[in-house]
Curated annotation (Swiss-Prot):
Pfam families: Beta-prop_EIPR1, WD40. The modification N-acetylmethionine is found at M1. PANTHER family: EARP AND GARP COMPLEX-INTERACTING PROTEIN 1, WD-REPEAT PROTEIN. The gene is EIPR1. This is EARP and GARP complex-interacting protein 1. The modification Phosphoserine is found at S320. It comes from Macaca fascicularis (Crab-eating macaque). Belongs to the WD repeat EIPR1 family. It comes from the Eukaryota. Residues 322-334 have a biased composition (Basic and acidic residues). Keywords: Acetylation, Golgi apparatus, Phosphoprotein, Repeat, WD repeat. PROSITE patterns: WD_REPEATS_1, WD_REPEATS_2, WD_REPEATS_REGION. GO terms for cellular component: trans-Golgi network.
Length: 387
């Protein structure tokens, strides 16, 4: 059973921002934001045609500045948010804004990657997440499963909850909270939990993970020294409401149960440099992706702490007598955690990895040199999980 070869797409600029087009559940589509100091920055809309194993793309101009973070609306295929750098009075500010892509590009393109004659189109600015009080936006996170009207931005040591109004043309600050404590505390990353009616957000600052209740903007849990060095990213298990994964500059990936934060449930030490990204598969939460500046992407099978620790359980009625004994033996033993595959198509730091929102077996990774790689979960494992 041969696995499909990875598909590679090269951007002409450096890049570190990647997101699937979250509201698109039929076509495989990713958005990539570039980081260029000399030229106008771009957002590449990458369409993957999995039948023919080819990539089609469209390019949007993002003239506001180099893109540090990109996220897509969960409700509207045409709306996205970016965090970007701009200079003001010889100071660099990281701002955030919500944009709309041209209508005809929302559902993808049929242009081949080598067609360079086409002209790039521009994004329509919907609103700035006005940051006059806060100068450094780390990321913008949309309310999962929401109507695309609620977003959170992390700026310096503040969490800002925004309501988007008037077709997203206006952002109203609904509530906020800030990190207290000594020194210049600064958020590095955050995720909005899909559980608890979407009332919880987790953030990372320095080596600490914190949970927040968005109704009161108060802290609900705190994991101090979650990592030995800076925490780079975190993600919620989509099927187990108290489970959270984090990664950081100590080269580790840790899994937490937020009801008991004294120590991690599990720790992975497979990378040899900073781990920038961790992502749970949206459907099969034992599949966990990580990307690191060791230039590798690792796919792990964390089945023992997943929602199906005994594999795919079958109803008794479906089992014939001969199979009965075999499946009984199989179901007693939890399956073992292991590294499924290490992907080495990158030659530079991998700053972003993410799963497709349309195909649970497909993911993209992005390295700083502008190389986007699309890979799939090995077929043997896919069938093992499904059957």
């Amino acid at each position: 059973m041969e696995d499909d070869a990875p598909v590679i797409y090269g951007l002409e600029f450096q890049a570190r921002a990647l997101t699937p087009q979250t509201a698109e559940t039929d076509a495989i589509r990713f958005l990539v934001g570039t980081q260029s100091l000399k030229y106008d920055n771009q957002i590449h809309i990458i369409d993957f045609d999995d039948e023919n194993n080819i990539i089609n793309k469209n390019v949007l101009l993002h003239q506001a500045g180099e893109i540090w973070h990109i996220s897509a609306s969960p409700a509207d295929r045409g709306v996205l948010a970016t965090c970007y750098n701009r200079t003001s009075d010889s100071k660099v500010l990281t701002c955030a804004a919500v944009w709309r892509m041209p209508k005809e590009l929302e559902s993808g393109s049929h242009e081949s990657p080598d067609d360079s004659s086409s002209t790039a189109q521009t994004l329509e600015l919907l609103c700035h997440l006005d940051n006059t009080a806060h100068s450094n936006m780390a990321c913008v996170v949309w309310e999962p499963m929401g109507d695309g009207k609620k977003i959170i931005s992390l700026a310096d040591n503040h969490i800002l909850l925004w309501d988007l109004q008037e077709s997203s043309s206006q952002a109203v600050l609904a509530s906020s909270a800030s990190l207290g404590g000594k020194g210049q505390l600064k958020f590095t990353s955050g995720r909005w939990s899909p559980h608890h009616n979407c009332t919880q957000v987790a953030t990372a600052n320095d080596t600490t993970l914190r949970g927040w209740d968005t109704r009161t903007m108060s802290q609900i849990y705190c994991i101090e020294n979650a990592h030995g060095q800076l925490v780079r990213d975190l993600d919620f298990n989509p099927n187990k409401q108290y489970y959270l994964a984090s990664c950081g500059d100590d080269c580790k990936v840790k899994f937490w149960d937020t009801r008991n934060v004294t120590e991690p449930v599990k720790t992975l030490e497979e990378h040899s440099h900073w781990v920038w990204n961790v992502r749970y598969n949206h459907s099969h939460d034992q599949l966990v992706l990580t990307g690191s500046s060791d230039s590798r992407v690792i796919l792990s099978n964390m089945v023992s702490i997943s929602s199906e620790p005994f594999g795919h359980l079958v109803d008794d009625d479906d089992i014939s007598d001969q199979e009965d004994h075999r499946s009984e033996e199989k179901s007693k033993e939890p399956l073992q955690d292991n590294v499924i595959a290490t992907y080495e198509e990158h030659e530079d730091s991998v700053y972003a990895v993410d799963w497709s929102s349309a195909d649970p077996w497909l993911f993209a990774s992005l390295s700083y040199d502008g190389r986007l790689v699309i890979n799939r979960v090995p077929r043997a494992l896919k069938y093992h999980i499904l059957l």
